[in-house]
Amino acid sequence: PVTAGDFVYAWRRAASPELASPYAWYMSLMAVEGVDAVIAGEAPLDSLGVSAPDDHTLVVQLSTPLPYFAQMTTHATTFPVPQAVIEEFGDAWTQPDHIVSNGAYVLSDHVPQERSVRVRNDMYWNNDATIIEEVVALVINDENQALTRYLAGELDRTEVPAGQYPRLSEEYPDEALSFPR
């Protein structure tokens, strides 16, 4: 089971100067107490303003009020990571055979710069309501090529290339959707 300690471990990893996470800047934007000193290596990891008084409670201290803080916790940098798995497998902890998933799907295959495949997670709390068996995400670097494949029925969804939304929303009013990122 996921515990509050898994969040603390993840947030400390993100701010760790030893690991030099490419998303350390995100922790700084979140205004977590002490984050800049931790990232700079001027303070120990346990001085970061995040703690877990028990398995079900995460306490975050901010250095300044941040009205959008809750929304910032939807970024993957803030997701829990299992310390025991990382310690056992090191850099291979994110491989399909080792990665721990908390959601409706688990990673079953990953080919960098090509695709990732996820299958239903039997351990998911609401697995009975999960109706899609497998999700395949393809890496398509050209939005126009992706749109062509979508229109040919090869993809279920894609990003809309810049400037094409007005035309697509007229031609495909039930399919072309716009929402904030």
Stretches found by the model and what they are:
Residues 1, 63, 181:
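Periplasmic solute-binding protein
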Residues 4, 23, 66, 162-165:
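Alpha-helix initiation and N-capping motif
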Residues 1-26, 53, 59, 146-152:
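Aromatic- and charge-enriched surface segment that lines or borders ligand/interaction sites
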Residues 2, 69-73, 167:
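Periplasmic-binding protein-like
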